[in-house]
């Protein structure tokens, strides 16, 4: 009887772990049926993606809200939170970082690097 309870408990823990991993995963993009809206044809629109986004959007402009699930800020801007901390990228696992797109107050110039999901599009 003890073996059965231990086995059942182990199965429940494994199932819970798998469900948590799937909840943090992005669904694959189906480009055969996907219909993306065209982006504006101007220099102000820098194509970027949300963490699980399949279609490009214009990157965040100055004073736009930014966090781990929004499209990244324009390459000339950084995401600044209420304490003044700057991030060029807010990664999907940084759940507590929320801010607005602003010009950097630091003297260091950021060099833009494509996110992993941006190079695959």
Curated annotation (Swiss-Prot):
Keyword Glycoprotein present in the record's keywords: the answer is yes
InterPro entries from the xrefs?
Answer: Growth_fac_rcpt_cys_sf, IGFBP-like, Insulin_GF-bd_Cys-rich_CS
Q: In which tissues is it expressed?
A: Component of the acid-insoluble organic matrix of calcified layers of the shell (at protein level).
Keyword annotations from UniProtKB, A to Z: Disulfide bond, Glycoprotein, Secreted, Signal
Disulfide bonds listed in the record: 26-52, 29-54, 36-55, 45-58, 66-79, 73-101
Tell me which positions the record assigns to the signal sequence: 1-23
Give glycosylation sites per the record. 68, 81, 117
Key word Kinase present = no
- Extract one GO cellular component term from the record: extracellular region
What subcellular compartments does it reside in?
A: Secreted
Supply the SUPFAM superfamilies for this chain.
Growth factor receptor domain
Domain named IGFBP N-terminal: which ranges? 24-104
Q: What is this protein called?
A: Perlustrin-like protein
User: Which species does this protein come from?
Assistant: Lottia gigantea (Giant owl limpet)
Q: What is the lineage of its organism?
A: Eukaryota, Metazoa, Spiralia, Lophotrochozoa, Mollusca
């Amino acid at each position: 009887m003890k073996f059965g309870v231990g086995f059942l408990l182990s199965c429940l823990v494994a199932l819970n772990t798998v469900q948590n991993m799937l909840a943090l995963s992005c669904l694959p993009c189906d480009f055969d049926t996907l219909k993306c809206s065209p982006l504006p044809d101007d220099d102000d629109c820098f194509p970027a993606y949300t963490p699980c986004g399949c279609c490009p959007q214009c990157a965040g402009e100055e004073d736009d809200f930014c966090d781990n699930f929004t499209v990244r800020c324009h390459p000339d801007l950084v995401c600044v939170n209420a304490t003044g901390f700057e991030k060029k990228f807010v990664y999907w696992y940084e759940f507590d970082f929320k801010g607005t797109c602003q010009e950097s107050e630091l003297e260091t110039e950021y060099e833009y690097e494509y996110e992993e999901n941006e190079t695959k599009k």
